Amino acid sequence: LTVSLNTGEWHDFMLEGEGQRLVVPVDIFLFVNGTIIPGGEIVVGEEGRLAGQMMTTPYTTEANLTLYHPDGRSTAIDLPVLEGLPIVNGEEWFQKMDYITSVCSDSTECGGYINRWMGSGNPQFERAAAYFKGHFEGLGYETHMMRVFDHGNPTQPESLNVIAWKEGRNDSCVQGMGAHMDVAPPGSLAGTYEGAYDNTAGTVSMMLYARAFVDLTFECDTFLALWSSEEEGLRGSNAFATNDCDYCLPKDKELKFYINMDMMGISWPAHKANGDPFPYHAWSGPDFDPNEQDVAITDVLDHVHRNVLKAPMNLTIDGSYGSGCDQHWDEHSNLVMDVHEDTFGRSDHVTFRDLGAQTIFHLGAYDDDYDAYHSPTDTLDNMVSEVGGQEELEKSIEFVMWAAMLEFLIADQTPEIRNVGV
């Protein structure tokens, strides 16, 4: 019997014998009872048997495991690694993107969930929100449509969010992940109808995470959210954070961390037409002192990219990118992997950062590096064209989706990640 591992997939295992200790490489993850085990090491207790799962990444190439025996001996276990279908993958992301943004007479082929601008009682937004809510509900999440009217006109809802909750082990804390589902409203010089990059891409990422997280167990109560009104000033996430309702952000629990997905897919490893890689932005916060690391989630951000995914952290281009981080831009302007602590705002992570949560913000290329967002050219076809084909886009989005997912899983089991106000 030959045992192998497939990239990006789950693999069941069973260890027998008290004191047996299994150690795995940094890019293979152990889960017991649905929870990631930090450090990649487990020991069989007095019960004499331990069942769990291993998860590889799409980029795992070797599986060199070591089993340490109670008598001091050890056994090397080298398993072949085969190409698999990752639990979160670019191909499924693209299929869902294509369905949501396509318009045709066959509803099985085209969802037509476009024109999702917020603030005018838009029936297209209502229809899309109901579709997204149904996705989370169908997976078994406690899901709510959150409406807030704060100007007295019910035909112009201030915000309409989709909030999916997953109960954690610890009732005293809360954490979350989200993306805004609204698109820039139409105007004479701006506006979009697909909003493929900004932010159908992040919305679909959240849909895939919800499926991947169904059978996992987290430390804290966890919200997976699709925000409205980001384009009108973060009103959706602010409504969730500041209002009192059964499914709003609880005020009596410690808000530990939040990860935000906005404008996804146009980033390294995809390349521009001139051959340069697109910049890759991922910023942690709060960043109180640009000369010091302020928060523990920065260690998770760096570890995932540098050690687990083995990203080219020192890769540079000749010249300079069009835009990037707030801090350190003078020394980072030509850096492909713009991954560090920073004060950068402009999206829904600011809502939670202002409440003391440690945050990570994933953002693709923007402004001079890719300026199609907030315009009629923000389409899936344009994204494909800009990166040189569908396969390249799928590779690009798959990398950042795995980075954010691993950050979330590891942060969940990192006790040092606390609200900075504690």
PLM features per residue range, with description:
Residues 227-359:
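Metal-dependent peptidase/peptidase-like ectodomains
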Residues 363-422:
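His/Asp/Glu-rich mid-to-C-terminal helical/loop segments that flank catalytic regions of hydrolases
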Residues 3, 13-19:
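Aromatic/hydrophobic beta-strand junction motif of beta-rich domains
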Residues 68, 72-125, 166, 420:
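N-terminal hydrophobic or amphipathic helices/low-complexity stretches enriched
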Residues 48-59:
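Short, hydrophobic beta-strand segments
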